[in-house]
Curated annotation (Swiss-Prot):
Residues 22-71 form the PSI domain. Keywords: Calcium, Cell adhesion, Cell junction, Cell membrane, Disulfide bond, EGF-like domain, Glycoprotein, Integrin, Magnesium, Membrane, Metal-binding, Receptor, Repeat, Signal, Transmembrane, Transmembrane helix. Integrin alpha-V:beta-6 (ITGAV:ITGB6) is a receptor for fibronectin and cytotactin. It recognizes the sequence R-G-D in its ligands. ITGAV:ITGB6 acts as a receptor for fibrillin-1 (FBN1) and mediates R-G-D-dependent cell adhesion to FBN1. Integrin alpha-V:beta-6 (ITGAV:ITGB6) mediates R-G-D-dependent release of transforming growth factor beta-1 (TGF-beta-1) from regulatory Latency-associated peptide (LAP), thereby playing a key role in TGF-beta-1 activation. Belongs to the integrin beta chain family. The chain crosses the membrane at residues 709-729. Heterodimer of an alpha and a beta subunit. Interacts with FLNB. Interacts with HAX1. ITGAV:ITGB6 interacts with FBN1. ITGAV:ITGB6 interacts with TGFB1. Residues 131-371 form the VWFA domain. It is found in: Cell membrane; Cell junction, Focal adhesion. This is Integrin beta-6. Ca(2+) 2 binds at E179, N235, D237, P239, E240. Ca(2+) 1 binds at S144, D147, D148, D271, K355.
C-alpha cells in the first residue's frame, strides 16, 4: 500500500492544472495517441473501464482516471527521466597528469523525454589551474608586414617567459600565409613569379598560400631561430588568403601538434582583410573547400589553387570541432571587419595590433586572460525537434535566464548552468548531443530518446475473443478492429450498417458532426465545455446565451441551446429576477414614484432622479430658483462673507464645487439677478443625493454709466451753450449798432446848413505888399507871423 501511495504522489506531481482537461476531450483512441496529447495525459488499460462511449474516456489525467475507477497498475503514464552514466567530480587545483583533468560534470547521461514535456539538468564547469597551452602563431608575410617580421624575432623567448607565469606547460609553433598563387591574386610575369618584389627592387619569396613552418614545441629559441629566417612575399590585391591558413592550421591536428588535453590558441596576425567563400571564382576556382588537411611533404598547402576559400560557416565548424580559440591581432583599419567575424566564431577575440607588431606580446597575454575569464557552453549534434534553453548561475550567485555564458570568472571558480530540454514529436531513433565549454576538450554526451510507447503495447491479443468473435486485436484495454469491422468491440460490419440512421435529416452530417456512428447509433464526442447528447448529438448544455460571462446568468440550466430559468428568474439569459422587493422605497412606494421596476431594479424616469429606489432627486420641483440666495451670495461675497454664503447654501441643501463632474446628468439653470444680469449654473447630485452646484457665471449684464464721459459731455455742452449765447448777443448788438448808424446817416443827410465863416475863426496866413521893391515884376512876399 505504501508503494502505491508513493507512485500516486509521483503521478500527481506532474499534473498541470491549466491543461488538465485537454486529455479527456483529445479524442485519443490509442495509448500512443494519448501520450502525444500532452505530458500530463495518461491512459487506462484496464479492461471494461468504459462502456459504449469507447476509448476516448481512457485518456485523462492520472488523478481523473483514478477518480473514474481505473486502478493504479493499469495507468500508463511514462515520465521524462534522466539517467546519469558518468559523473566524475570536477578537478580542484593543479593536476600532475593532464589526462586526469575534469572540467565539466556530468560527462555522460541518457535523457528520455515525453513529447511536450521538459526535463532540466544541471551542468557544472570549472577551469582548472595550470592548464596546458598550445599557441600557434599564424603570420601574414605579405610585403606590408616586413617591419612586423623584424619586431617578432625575439618574440618566442619573451612570450615563453610571460606565459610561464600563467602555466607551466606551454608550447608554441609558427606558420605563415600570403595568397593563392594564381592570377588575378599574384603577378604572372616570369620575373615577378620568381620575385614578386622585383619592381621595387627587392628580393622576396614567390607568392604562396600557407606554409606550416614550426610544429608546436616548448623550445622558445627554436621559435626565434625560425622567425629570423623568414622572408616576406607579395601579392596584388589587398585581401589575403588568411582563412585558407586558418582552416589548415585547425584541421591538420597531427602536423601542427595540437594536444588533446590543452588549450588551443591560434594567433592570427595581419594588416589586411581575408578572402572567403566564392572570392576564388575570380581565378576560376569553383570546387568548394572540403575542410580537410592538405599539407604536402614540404608542409605547404597543396590545394591552394584547386579549392575555394573556406566560408565563415566552415571555419566555425572546424574551429569548434578541434577546440581552437582564435585570436585576431589586426591593425586599426581592419579591426571593425574582424570584430564582425569574431561575433560569429565562438570564443574568438580581436586585439588592436600596432603598425610594427610592437604590442603583440601584451595583446596575446590580454587575449589569453580574457579567454580564461569566460565560460561559454556550445551545443553540437542534431537538435532538430528539440528545444533547449539555458540559465547561467555564475560565481556571483546571480541567475541569468536565457544565457549560456559567464564572464569575469577566476580560474578555479565554478559556473553552473541549468539546461532545460524538451522534444516536440515522437521518433523511434535516439540522437546524440554534445554540450561542451567553448575551447575546451571536456564534453557532456547526452543520448536523447522520445518516450512515446506504453508498456501495455507489448501485450497484444491477436484475433481476441474480447473483440466479438475475434474480429480484432485486444491491446491496452481496447480493440483494434480488423478491416471490415467497427465498433468498440468490433461488433458491427461496415457493409451491414448505414450512417443514414445517424443523420437527423438528409443532407445533415452524421451525428451532427459531433459524434461517431457505431452500429447505427451515435456516440457523442467529449467536449471540454460540457456534455453533448441527443440521438443525433444535436444537443449540448453549453451553447446557451451568457450574461456577464455566466451561462444563463448562472440562474438557469442550458438544455439543447435554450436557457431553462430557475424559479424567481426570467428572460432570455435568465438574468431578470421576478422579485420587486428591491424596488420598494422606505414609504413602500415602488421606485419612489419616479421610475419603473425592471428585472428587480428601478429604472428612474424623472431627470435627475437616482438611487436604488430613485429616492434621490435634487432636480425635482424648482431646483434653480430655490438656490437663488446661495448663488447671489456666492457672486457678491468677498473673503469675509464666505462663511455666511456657506450657511445660505446649506439652508437650500446645496454646496458649491469647482471640481470636475459629468455634464451628462446635470441640470442647467438660469436666473435674473438683482443687477439685471443673467446667472447660469449647473446642478448635479453626488452619490449620497446631495445637490452640487457647478460652473456659476454671469452674462448679458447691463454696462454701468461712464461718469467721466458724462461730466465731460455736460461740461462741453455748457461751454457750447455759452459760446452760442455769446454769439447771439454779439449778433444782436451788431445788428442794433448798424441800425443806429443807418438812422444817424439818414438824419444827417436831411439837415440844411448855411455857408459862412466863423467870426471867431482866424486864418493861419497873412499877405503883405512891399512898397520898396523896385523891380518891375511883382514879387509876392509871404511873411509868416506867429503873432
Amino acid at each position: 500500500m505504501g508503494i502505491e501511495l508513493v507512485c500516486l504522489f509521483l503521478l500527481l506531481l506532474g499534473r498541470n492544472d491549466h491543461v488538465q482537461g485537454g486529455c479527456a476531450w483529445s479524442g485519443a483512441e490509442t495509448c500512443s495517441d494519448c501520450l502525444l496529447t500532452g505530458p500530463h495525459c495518461a491512459w487506462c488499460s484496464q479492461e471494461n473501464f468504459t462502456h459504449l462511449s469507447g476509448a476516448g474516456e481512457r485518456c485523462d489525467t492520472p488523478e481523473n482516471l483514478l477518480a473514474k475507477g481505473c486502478q493504479l497498475p493499469f495507468i500508463e503514464n511514462p515520465v521524462s527521466q534522466v539517467e546519469i552514466l558518468q559523473n566524475k567530480p570536477l578537478s580542484v587545483g593543479r593536476q600532475k597528469n593532464s589526462s586526469d583533468i575534469v572540467q565539466i560534470a556530468p560527462q555522460s547521461l541518457v535523457l528520455k523525454l515525453r513529447p511536450g514535456g521538459e526535463q532540466t539538468l544541471q551542468v557544472q564547469v570549472r577551469q582548472t589551474e595550470d592548464y596546458p597551452v598550445d599557441l600557434y602563431y599564424l603570420m601574414d608575410l605579405s610585403a606590408s608586414m616586413d617591419d612586423d617580421l623584424n619586431t617578432i624575432k625575439e618574440l618566442g623567448s619573451r612570450l615563453a617567459k610571460e606565459m610561464s607565469k600563467l602555466t607551466s606547460n606551454f608550447r608554441l609553433g609558427f606558420g605563415s600565409f600570403v595568397e593563392k598563387p594564381v592570377s588575378p591574386f599574384m603577378k604572372t610575369t616570369p620575373e615577378e613569379i620568381t620575385n614578386p618584389c622585383s619592381s621595387i627592387p627587392y628580393f622576396c619569396l614567390p607568392t604562396f598560400g600557407f606554409k606550416h613552418i614550426l610544429p608546436l614545441t616548448d623550445d622558445a629559441e627554436r621559435f626565434n631561430e625560425i622567425v629570423r629566417k623568414q622572408k616576406i612575399s607579395a601579392n596584388i590585391d589587398t585581401p589575403e588568403g588568411g582563412f585558407d591558413a586558418i582552416m589548415q592550421a585547425a584541421v591538420c591536428k597531427e602536423k601542427i601538434g595540437w594536444r588533446n588535453d590543452s588549450l588551443h590558441l591560434l594567433v592570427f596576425v595581419s594588416d589586411a582583410d581575408s578572402h572567403f567563400g566564392m572570392d576564388s571564382k575570380l581565378a576560376g576556382i569553383v570546387i568548394p573547400n572540403d575542410g580537410l588537411c592538405h599539407l604536402d611533404n614540404r608542409n605547404e598547402y597543396s590545394m591552394s589553387t584547386v579549392l575555394e576559400y573556406p566560408t565563415i560557416g566552415q571555419l566555425i565548424d572546424k574551429l569548434v570541432q578541434n577546440n581552437v580559440l582564435l585570436i585576431f591581432a589586426v591593425t586599426q583599419e581592419q579591426v571593425h571587419l574582424y570584430e564582425n567575424y569574431a561575433k560569429l566564431i565562438p570564443g574568438a577575440t580581436v586585439g588592436l595590433l600596432q603598425k610594427d607588431s610592437g604590442n603583440i606580446l601584451q595583446l596575446i597575454i590580454s587575449a589569453y586572460e580574457e579567454l580564461r575569464s569566460e565560460v561559454e557552453l556550445e551545443v553540437l549534434g542534431d537538435t532538430e525537434g528539440l528545444n533547449l534553453s539555458f540559465t547561467a548561475l555564475c560565481s556571483n550567485g546571480i541567475l541569468f535566464p536565457h544565457q549560456k555564458k559567464c564572464s569575469h570568472m577566476k580560474v578555479g571558480d565554478t559556473a553552473s548552468f541549468n539546461v532545460s530540454v524538451s522534444i516536440t514529436n515522437c521518433e523511434k531513433r535516439s540522437r546524440k548531443l554534445i554540450i561542451k565549454p567553448v575551447g575546451l576538450g571536456d564534453t557532456l554526451e547526452i543520448l536523447v530518446s522520445a518516450e512515446c510507447d506504453c508498456d501495455c503495447q507489448r501485450e497484444v491479443e491477436a484475433n481476441s475473443s474480447k473483440c466479438h468473435h475475434g474480429n480484432g486485436s485486444f491491446q491496452c484495454g481496447v480493440c483494434a478492429c480488423n478491416p471490415g469491422h467497427m465498433g468498440p468491440r468490433c461488433e458491427c460490419g461496415e457493409d451491414m450498417v448505414s450512417t443514414d440512421s445517424c443523420k437527423e435529416s438528409p443532407g445533415h452530417p452524421s451525428c451532427s458532426g459531433r459524434g461517431d456512428c457505431y452500429c447505427g447509433q451515435c456516440v457523442c464526442h467529449l467536449s471540454p465545455y460540457g456534455s453533448i447528447y441527443g440521438p443525433y448529438c444535436q444537443c449540448d448544455n453549453f451553447s446557451c446565451l451568457r450574461h456577464k460571462g455566466l451561462l444563463c446568468g448562472d440562474n438557469g440550466d442550458c438544455d439543447c441551446g435554450e436557457c431553462v430559468c430557475r424559479d424567481g428568474w426570467t428572460g432570455e439569459y435568465c438574468n431578470c429576477t421576478t422579485s420587486r422587493d428591491a424596488c420598494a422605497s422606505e414609504d413602500g412606494v415602488l421606485c419612489s414614484g419616479r421610475g419603473d421596476c425592471v428585472c428587480g431594479k428601478c429604472v428612474c424616469r424623472n431627470p435627475g432622479a437616482s438611487g436604488p429606489t430613485c429616492e434621490r432627486c435634487p432636480t425635482c420641483g424648482d431646483p434653480c430658483n430655490s438656490r437663488r440666495s446661495c448663488i447671489e451670495c456666492y457672486l457678491s461675497a468677498d473673503g469675509q462673507a464666505q462663511e455666511e454664503c456657506e450657511d445660505k447654501c446649506k439652508a437650500t441643501g446645496a454646496t458649491i464645487s469647482e471640481e470636475e463632474f459629468s455634464k451628462d446628468t446635470s441640470v442647467p439653470c438660469s436666473l435674473q439677478g438683482e443687477n439685471e444680469c443673467l446667472i447660469t449654473f449647473l446642478i448635479t447630485a453626488d452619490n449620497e443625493g446631495k445637490t452640487i452646484i457647478h460652473n456659476i457665471s454671469e452674462k448679458d449684464c447691463p454696462k454701468p454709466p461712464n461718469i467721466p464721459m458724462i461730466m465731460l459731455g455736460v461740461s462741453l455742452a455748457i461751454l457750447l451753450i455759452g459760446v452760442v449765447l455769446l454769439c447771439i448777443w454779439k449778433l444782436l448788438v451788431s445788428f442794433h449798432d448798424r441800425k443806429e448808424v443807418a438812422k444817424f446817416e439818414a438824419e444827417r443827410s436831411k439837415a440844411k446848413w448855411q455857408t459862412g465863416t466863423n467870426p471867431l475863426y482866424r486864418g493861419s496866413t497873412s499877405t503883405f505888399k512891399n512898397v520898396t521893391y523896385k523891380h518891375r515884376e511883382k514879387h509876392k512876399v509871404g511873411l509868416s507871423s506867429d503873432g
